[in-house]
């Protein structure tokens, strides 16, 4: 599926659980959460962004900042800028809606979240990927989105 075809994701607001249980903050983003392995050697110019920062107390925000710095220490993300995404819904620059890497089987491609409705999100792929309609896959390998997708 590629071009206007897309991957429909189940549960677009997703939370990391098992392998990083020490990182206890609940992380959500409308449309999904992309977690990048800290040992991914090809990444450069990393920004670590959080949202909904206005919903926590200043002391909690400082504690979370420290947890993030400790979490990425001795990884390719050590020294990365840590900041927050602030802005009214629909008022953020377009780049914040285009941060998706999608694994389908053993293939990876870019994608853009084009729609979110209830517990489904639609991602339009940037390049064609060979697969079959109805195929269900867990997202895996280096780029991980906690959850699953079904080709439609």
From Swiss-Prot:
S-S pairs: none
Ligand binding (GTP): 51-54
Annotated compartments: Cytoplasm, Cytosol
Superkingdom: Eukaryota
Sequence positions bearing N-acetylalanine: 1
Gene Ontology process terms (BP): cytoplasmic translational initiation; formation of translation preinitiation complex; translational initiation
Gene Ontology CC: one annotated term: cytosol
One Pfam family in the UniProt entry: eIF2_C
Signal sequence annotation: none
Any one GO molecular-function label of the UniProt entry: methionyl-initiator methionine tRNA binding
Protein function: Member of the eIF2 complex that functions in the early steps of protein synthesis by forming a ternary complex with GTP and initiator tRNA. This complex binds to a 40S ribosomal subunit, followed by mRNA binding to form the 43S pre-initiation complex (43S PIC). Junction of the 60S ribosomal subunit to form the 80S initiation complex is preceded by hydrolysis of the GTP bound to eIF2 and release of an eIF2-GDP binary complex. In order for eIF2 to recycle and catalyze another round of initiation, the GDP bound to eIF2 must exchange with GTP by way of a reaction catalyzed by eIF-2B.
Family designation: Belongs to the TRAFAC class translation factor GTPase superfamily. Classic translation factor GTPase family. EIF2G subfamily.
Protein name: Eukaryotic translation initiation factor 2 subunit 3
Native organism: Oryctolagus cuniculus
């Amino acid at each position: 599926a590629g071009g206007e075809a897309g991957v429909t994701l189940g549960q677009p607001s997703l939370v990391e659980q098992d392998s990083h249980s020490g990182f206890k903050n609940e992380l959500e983003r409308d449309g999904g959460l992309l977690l990048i392995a800290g040992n991914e050697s090809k990444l450069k110019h990393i920004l670590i962004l959080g949202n909904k920062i206005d919903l926590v107390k200043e002391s909690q925000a400082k504690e979370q900042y420290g947890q993030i710095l400790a979490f990425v220490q001795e990884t390719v993300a050590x020294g990365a800028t840590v900041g927050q995404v602030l802005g009214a819904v629909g008022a953020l620059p377009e780049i914040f809606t285009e941060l998706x890497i999608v694994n389908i089987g053993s293939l990876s491609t870019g994608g853009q979240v084009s729609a979110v409705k209830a517990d489904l999100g639609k991602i339009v792929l940037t390049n064609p990927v060979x697969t079959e309609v109805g195929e269900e896959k867990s997202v895996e390998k280096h780029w991980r989105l906690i959850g699953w997708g079904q080709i439609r």
